[in-house]
Amino acid sequence: MPTQASQKRWKQILQSIYDAIEDHGYPPTVREIGKSVGLSSSSTVAAYLEKLLAAGLIAKDPAKPRTLEVTSAGRDFIGVQDHGIPIVGTVAAGVPITAIENIDDYFPVPDDLPYAADELFMLRVQGNSMIKIGILDGDQIIVKKQNDAENGQIVVAMTEEDEATVKRFYKEKNGIRLHPENDSMDDMFFPDVTILGIVVSLYRPALV
C-alpha cells in the first residue's frame, strides 16, 4: 500500500484520468495529467503511472496510443460507483441519423457478458437494415467500446457526416464498406469511418 502522501497523489492522478475520459471520451496525456495535479516533471508522472499499473488501478494497451483507463479497482479507490451500462441515445439502422451522446439511463450488465460496465454502451436501434440477423427496430444493442474491427463484425460506426450507424463492417482496397443485413438496401461506401465499437449483445424490451 502507498504511504498516506502517495495515496493522496494516486487519487489525484486517478481522478484526473477518470475525469478526462468522462469529459472527452479519451484519456489525458502525461503532460496533461501533470498539469492537472501540479506535477511539472513528466518522468515523475510516468513513474506514478507505472505504480498505478502495477497496483491494477489503471490499465492500458501497450500496442496502442492513448488507451489508458481506470479499472474497477481504480474506481473503487477514488470512490466512483459503477451505475451500469450507459444508454447514450439512438443509432440508425437504415438511413443514418445523428447519434445522441448524452447518457439517457443505465442498464445492468448481463451476467453472461465478460465485460465491465465501463467497456460498454447501449444504443437504441431505429430502422430495419439489420433484420436478417435479428436486430429489429426498437432493439437496444450492447456495444463494446473499441476503435477497430475485423471484416464481418457488426459495428457502430461514425461516418464523415458525424452520423452513427450500425452495419456489418468490411475494409476494402478503396475504403470502407458498411453492409446492411436487409436485401432491399444497398451497401454504403466511405473513404473512412470512425468505429465506436462492436455489437456484443442485444436487449429487446418486453411488449406490454
Swiss-Prot record:
Disulfide bonds: none
Keyword set includes DNA-binding: yes
Major enzyme class: hydrolase
Domain of life according to the entry: Bacteria
Catalytic center residues: 129 (for autocatalytic cleavage activity), 167 (for autocatalytic cleavage activity)
Keywords: Autocatalytic cleavage, DNA damage, DNA repair, DNA replication, DNA-binding, Hydrolase, Repressor, SOS response, Transcription, Transcription regulation
Keyword DNA repair belongs to the record: yes
Ranges in a coiled coil: none
Site (Cleavage): 93-94
Residue ranges for the DNA-binding region feature of this UniProt entry: 30-50
GO biological process: DNA repair; DNA replication; negative regulation of DNA-templated transcription; proteolysis; SOS response
InterPro entries assigned: LexA (IPR006200), LexA-like (IPR039418), LexA/Signal_pep-like_sf (IPR036286), LexA_DNA-bd_dom (IPR006199), LexA_repressor (IPR050077), Peptidase_S24_LexA (IPR006197), Peptidase_S24_S26A/B/C (IPR015927), WH-like_DNA-bd_sf (IPR036388)
Known EC number: 3.4.21.88
CDD domains for the chain: S24_LexA-like
Catalyses which reaction(s): Hydrolysis of Ala-|-Gly bond in repressor LexA
Molecular function via GO: DNA binding; serine-type endopeptidase activity
Subunit structure: Homodimer.
Record-stated family: Belongs to the peptidase S24 family.
Function: Represses a number of genes involved in the response to DNA damage (SOS response), including recA and lexA. In the presence of single-stranded DNA, RecA interacts with LexA causing an autocatalytic cleavage which disrupts the DNA-binding part of LexA, leading to derepression of the SOS regulon and eventually DNA repair.
Alphabetized HAMAP family for the sequence: LexA
Stated name of the protein: LexA repressor
Organism of provenance: Lacticaseibacillus paracasei (strain ATCC 334 / BCRC 17002 / CCUG 31169 / CIP 107868 / KCTC 3260 / NRRL B-441) (Lactobacillus paracasei)
